[in-house]
């Protein structure tokens, strides 16, 4: 395979790739800078072992973290967490929010009951198939049916409908008003127990659903007024998928936590200083969120190389 063309070994045919491995491959297949002998040697070197990156720090990881934090993460987000898998990136964003909200409510004892805390999310969302995320995903029954889930508040998704000429085909202000009314109802029902509002800034699996900046700003306002964290799930849209490093930058409406994956190869979250409003948050309390491998060095090396390619070829311009 090469560039945007997939090669089928059985038929010896090439196919235009509109799949990109579930939107996880950002620069095409076998890019020359990925085949460079020096890079290939580095890749083979780190692939020979799989250290526990959360506890064993290597030069390769340090170089990657510096590159990602300075070349991909926008200013104002000093905290990072690395893991394998987009669903687990979202999962740990939720855990960070639950911990933050519990401490905001004065529940600092780790034995405290927090089962009343919930996550507000949208209809037609896809946030993964792991434990917490399964309660948020609601695209098709195939992916969530027969698995026990939490009954967390789910509200209308006010998506833009376009006519054939690109104009608005629906009363989007009315759709947003409906969503906001349902959000108000959810906050009234759950009082001060909504830990976070989570949204994909563009719903992919849910149907290529786009939202206006006005709605994202409304979510920002609710999160600020009701002491909830605003989480943007950019696992599918992030890392220049929209032309900018992160889709939310088109609207200049910053969340508190961003979950990323797919095109970044290694997955994870970056988080703003709002998390530091509570002491002993998950970035300060050792081991509160963790995994054995903390991502993969091979994925980190590949992600760093993608940053080189994107910058060298001006793909973000």
Q: Model-derived features: where do they sit?
A:
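Conserved N-terminal phosphate-binding loop of PLP-dependent enzymes in the Aspartate aminotransferase
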Residues: 1-317
